[in-house]
Regions:
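Substrate-binding pocket helix/loop in short-chain dehydrogenase/reductase
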Residues: 93-95, 99-107, 211
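C-terminal helical subdomain
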Residues: 2-3, 178, 186, 202-237, ...
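Short, small/polar-rich loop/turn modules that mediate ligand/substrate recognition or access, typified
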Residues: 170, 175, 241-243
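Active-site helix of classical SDR
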Residues: 118, 154, 162
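Short C-terminal tail/terminal secondary-structure segment
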Residues: 2-12, 89-92, 143, 219, ...
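The beta1-alpha1 cofactor-binding region of Rossmann-like NAD(H)/NADP(H)-dependent oxidoreductases
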Residues: 57-67, 100
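Residue(s) in the substrate-gating loop at a strand-loop-helix junction
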Residues: 138
Length: 258
């Protein structure tokens, strides 16, 4: 056993060049902080300029994505790791209550945006010593969530993309994994609960309790829990981990299926 791999599970190669989309807040910001603490050089993309990203971009717009990658090549000189984190929650409601335009927006950002970014990143990752793509999906990409069908559709697709890319890109020494977070506490989850409560005509406390009881630990996760999984995958200890869908969810999946 190479004990160095165990010791290095929380460290990455010094100067590892990483792009994190949606890195200005929430899970993305936690991933950025963790990777920087682990020794990486991180380029942050976000649509919100108030979060002070390295580059402001809407990843659903092809020209903006191309401009972002020109900035990455200028600032980093290449790329070793891509973390596809951008995602919007979208609407909540029954299928006949959701505006098709809102459905399209969720797919345009969460799915097409991820595809655009990855298509631009892969040529750079091929020139790295060892490339890595991490798709941040959701437990909504593993099993259904009523009233959240646009988001569920996008996240199931993100999981499928990740598993397919792992098979496509292995010969190029590019690993691809998917992380499926459970319910992460914070403003984003508060908005989800509010929308779902309105759609169902019940109180927010009831919705919140429902989410919490789906977790074996009976509490929401912290974004740092997801960030730790990303660091592991980017570390030497994760060098042969590819094609995996990792649930970081407090056993939400097993409780829902029991």
């Amino acid at each position: 056993m190479d004990e160095r791999l165990i010791l290095e599970a929380g460290r990455v190669k010094d100067g590892l060049r990483v792009l994190v989309t949606g890195g200005g807040s929430g899970i993305g910001a936690s991933v950025v902080d963790a990777l920087r603490s682990a020794g990486a050089k991180v380029f942050v993309c976000d649509i919100d300029p108030s979060t002070s990203p390295d580059h402001v971009a809407d990843i659903s717009q092809g020209q903006q994505v191309e401009e972002m990658f020109r900035a990455i090549e200028r600032d980093l000189g290449g790329l070793d790791v891509l973390v596809n984190n951008v995602g919007i929650a979208g609407p909540a409601g029954l299928v006949d209550e959701i505006d098709p335009n809102d459905f399209d927006e969720v797919l345009r950002v969460n799915l097409s945006g991820t595809f655009r970014v990855t298509a631009c990143a892969v040529p750079l990752l091929r020139t790295a010593d060892s490339g890595l793509i991490v798709n941040i999906a959701s437990t909504a990409g593993i099993f259904p969530y009523p009233y959240r069908s646009p988001y569920v559709a996008a996240k199931w697709a993100i999981v499928g993309l990740g598993r397919s890319w792992a098979m496509e890109l292995g010969e190029d020494n590019i690993r691809v994994n998917v992380i499926c977070p459970g319910s992460v506490g914070g403003p984003r989850m508060d908005q989800v609960i509010q929308k779902e409560a309105q759609a169902k005509g019940v109180g927010e406390a009831e919705i919140r309790s429902g989410y919490e009881t789906q977790v074996s630990m009976r509490r929401f996760m912290d974004a740092a829990d997801v960030a730790g999984a990303v660091v592991y995958m980017a570390s030497p200890a994760g060098r042969h981990v590819s094609g995996q869908v990792l649930s970081v969810d407090g056993a939400t999946e097993s409780l829902r299926s029991s």
